[in-house]
């Protein structure tokens, strides 16, 4: 399959990756279709040459399966934890790129009640103003 068109959607990311110190990426779908070994276009590179001044870049990746942290020195992700019901194997099988994996990977801790209250309250309400369909799907009736 040859991709010839570059589609919109990542307009600000190239700039933000240089100036925002800790960019946290999130994607609910965690499959090898989404997390491929090689992409057709790079909108915002995760790393750069040594002589390029850069304050920001990717910090973490949160998916429906796990939490990963980006290592700028190694220019790759490291698995930090797997969500309930997932395993290192299920994450690996559904990831098309190489990532570091420590010998012991814990389960992602569940959020505390006060965090859930804020997420389901003021954050969900604010999110619904810009992304109503997403907020409805994630939080239900707001």
PLM-predicted stretches and their roles:
Residues 4-104, 111:
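Conserved phosphate- and dinucleotide-binding cores of soluble alpha/beta proteins
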């Amino acid at each position: 399959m040859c991709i010839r068109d570059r589609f919109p959607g990542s307009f600000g990311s190239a700039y933000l990756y240089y100036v925002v110190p800790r960019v946290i990426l999130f994607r609910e779908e965690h499959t090898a279709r989404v997390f491929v070994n090689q992409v057709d276009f790079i909108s915002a590179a995760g790393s750069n040459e040594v002589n390029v001044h850069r304050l920001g870049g990717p910090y973490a990746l949160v998916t429906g399966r796990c939490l990963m942290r980006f290592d700028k020195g190694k220019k790759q992700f490291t698995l930090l934890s797997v969500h309930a019901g997932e395993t290192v194997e299920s994450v690996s099988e559904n990831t098309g790129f190489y990532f570091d994996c420590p010998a012991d990977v814990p389960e992602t801790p569940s959020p505390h009640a006060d965090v859930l209250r804020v997420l389901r309250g003021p954050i969900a309400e604010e999110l619904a103003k810009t992304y109503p369909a997403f907020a409805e799907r994630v939080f239900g009736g707001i």
